[in-house]
Amino acid sequence: MAGVDQHEGTIQVQGQNLFFRETRPGSGQPVRFSVLLLHGIRFSSETWQNLGTLQRLAEAGYRAVAIDLPGLGRSKEAAAPAPIGEPAPGSFLAAVVDTLELGPPVVISPSLSGMYSLPFLVAPGSQLRGFVPVAPICTDKINAVDYASVKTPALIVYGDQDPMGSSSFQHLKQLPNHRVLVMEGAGHPCYLDKPDEWHKGLLDFLQGLA
């Protein structure tokens, strides 16, 4: 991959082995900051590799790390810290960030991964540079006070053909510092339906972060 370094490996988080893929600028080029990519129940870190998101991020100067969540992808043997659909302790994603030395990262969180990202987002003292929720679950499990306390800039993304995107937005719009990207004609995995629009919106958002 020209101009980009990539590798994959396994980290141990709270006693569980998690698979990850990492892509960063090549040839010792400086890194702006890190981006942690999560995924939905039917997907894995491979989704972001195949879509070209990892490469696009690295080419733009970011360290991009995509993990396979517990019980999914190549982390299938790892036990999840909470049942699917229930918020996991914020400490889980904090441990991922610490182990991979990402902090403070931008977190990209589609669908299922909301059970991990939202508790991390609202945890007191959480270190996050930015948050990109893509129609995540568990938005109804966070209260208004916690949403209002979040200072992290957010880019809320969803497809206009996705009912889950619309319903999650009704909660996420309580985040004080947010902008919205609605993709016309796109469904639940809107980044797959409109990859060019996804990459442009994401990179524009990242460019505006310190």
UniProtKB/Swiss-Prot annotation:
Modified residues (Phosphoserine): S91
A Pfam cross-reference name: Abhydrolase_6
Principal location listed in the UniProt entry: cytoplasm
Localisation: Cytoplasm; Nucleus
Active site per database record: S111, D162, H188
Enzyme Commission code: 2.3.1.-
Transmembrane segments: none
Keywords: Acyltransferase, Cytoplasm, Nucleus, Phosphoprotein, Transferase
Entries under Gene3D superfamilies matching the protein: alpha/beta hydrolase
InterPro entries given in the database record: AB_hydrolase_1, AB_hydrolase_fold
UniProt similarity note: Belongs to the AB hydrolase superfamily. ABHD14 family.
PANTHER family linked: PROTEIN ABHD14B-LIKE, PROTEIN-LYSINE DEACYLASE ABHD14B-RELATED
Function text: Acts as an atypical protein-lysine deacetylase in vitro. Catalyzes the deacetylation of lysine residues using CoA as substrate, generating acetyl-CoA and the free amine of protein-lysine residues. Additional experiments are however required to confirm the protein-lysine deacetylase activity in vivo. Has hydrolase activity towards various surrogate p-nitrophenyl (pNp) substrates, such as pNp-butyrate, pNp-acetate and pNp-octanoate in vitro, with a strong preference for pNp-acetate. May activate transcription.
Protein name in UniProt: Putative protein-lysine deacylase ABHD14B
Gene that specifies this protein: Abhd14b
